[in-house]
Curated annotation (Swiss-Prot):
InterPro entries: YqgQ-like, YqgQ-like_sf. Signal peptide: none annotated. It comes from the Bacteria. This is Uncharacterized protein YqgQ. It comes from Bacillus subtilis (strain 168).
């Protein structure tokens, strides 16, 4: 699992399709959903850790991009 798309596809296998129109909120929600899946033993620790790392990186890039465009 290396990309944001990979994480989306993982969540999709559990019936989670996330779209709020706010990328930052979507990523934070996806992190919460991943945590719930892990805590309920639906995904392995390695899967959770890698997916969470991908999402944290994406969140950081999203926040930095948002700051960049604010001027």
């Amino acid at each position: 699992m290396n990309t944001f798309y990979d994480v989306q596809q993982l969540l999709k296998t559990f019936g989670h399709i996330v779209y709020f129109g706010d990328r930052e909120l979507e990523i934070e929600f996806m992190l919460d959903e991943l945590k719930e899946l892990y805590m309920n033993h639906m995904i392995e620790k390695e899967q959770w850790a890698r997916a969470a790392a991908v999402l944290r990186k994406e969140l950081e890039q999203t926040k930095n991009g948002r700051d960049f465009y604010k001027g």
